[in-house]
Amino acid sequence: MKKLNTSLSALALATLFTAPAFAVTEGELLIWINSDKGYEGLAEVGRQFEEDTGIKVNVQFPESLESRFQQVAATGDGPDIIFWAHDRFGSYAEAGLLREVKPSKEFQNKLIDFSWDAVNYNGKLIGYPLAIEAISLIYNKDLLPEPPKTWEELPAIQATMRALGKETIMWDVKNAYFTWPIVSAGSYSFKKTNDGYDASDIGINSEKARQNLAFLLDMTNQGIVNPGVDYANAESAFAQGNVAMTINGPWSWGNLDKAGLNYGVAAFPTLGNEKSNPFVGILSAGISSASPNEDLAVEFIENYLFTDGALKTINNDKPLGAVTLKTFQSSLESDARIKSTMINAENGEIMPAIPQMMTYWHSEGAAIENVLNGRQTIQDALATAEKQILR
């Protein structure tokens, strides 16, 4: 691929980003991506593709993209290529909205191995994994020079922080996504199989899961963990230097940088000698079943998007975090934050791309909240969640 230009004219941007057409057009590529991603960088890649092939590429970021795609693709309209977190791809595939993709082994080997698991649905690949999103333990280096290796160290850290008038840790505890690394240590969400997941085999009510939630309840009773704190308050308190640690993802780094905080990103501590298992989300590219441009979409994705130059352009627009393309990821790992994110991703659990995850989020979150607020016992809360998910 030729060297990418670094800017587009205002007119070109307006054409690429605000065009209202939702219908697929033969001989042109329409791409949808969320507005918080590097859509301007992606448009640069599209411009290069157009220069080389004569095929026009339109990049759009419609509101409520993930639900709108389901609506319009079902009627034969919408984009040729959609970018979204992989966990939504399972429901798209079940509805017949995504094409199976068949990249060569040579191409597959260019990407980090475990990332392909994210787009494996019933033994078929339904997209191309692009960027890896995993939460991490973020710590204030001025308050805590070294992060803990085990969660069992929290009471000792609490004693030190209390003497300084600071809090030990804050995060959005009631949100199962952020709390899963702790409560899942040594357990799992859905049983992994060769073809995907066994939705009838879930681990949220395993013996390990009950022990982990008991630990979290103990930390709450000791005043170390506060289940009443929401995401915004936790993020603000940490950015202001009032808390030693938080649990958050790469999207939070920008605000911490702006705040001038001296922070580090670490691998999660172990609990009961078991590694923490954060859920791993993969920004992925899927090809719509309604697209008449399958060959063009594959050409764009495999030979233009998945190159060091293209990913650098997108990353310069808005950071991708860790990426699946091995060559570009190696160039990013001089950033210790990205290296730690990748470690947590490798230790973590790919978010299952199955419809049952929609119930999981509500049921597991409610179980955590009810236990920590004293409304249910651990046994009752997790049994209820398990029953709801298995319905």
Pin down the residues of each PLM region.
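Conserved C-terminal helix/tail region of periplasmic/extracytoplasmic solute-binding proteins
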Residues: 344-391
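Conserved N-terminal structural module of periplasmic/extracytoplasmic solute-binding proteins
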Residues: 8-12, 22-89, 105, 272, ...
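Hinge/lid segment of periplasmic solute-binding proteins
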Residues: 86-136, 146, 151-158, 265-266, ...
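Glycine-centered hinge/linker elements that transmit conformational signals in sensory
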Residues: 158, 198-228
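Short helix-initiation/N-cap motifs at beta->coil->alpha
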Residues: 61-69, 87, 152-153, 226-240
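Extracytoplasmic/periplasmic substrate-binding proteins
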Residues: 45, 214-293
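Extracytoplasmic/periplasmic solute-binding protein
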Residues: 126-130, 135, 155-201, 243
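Mature extracytoplasmic/periplasmic domains
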Residues: 98, 251-254, 283-359
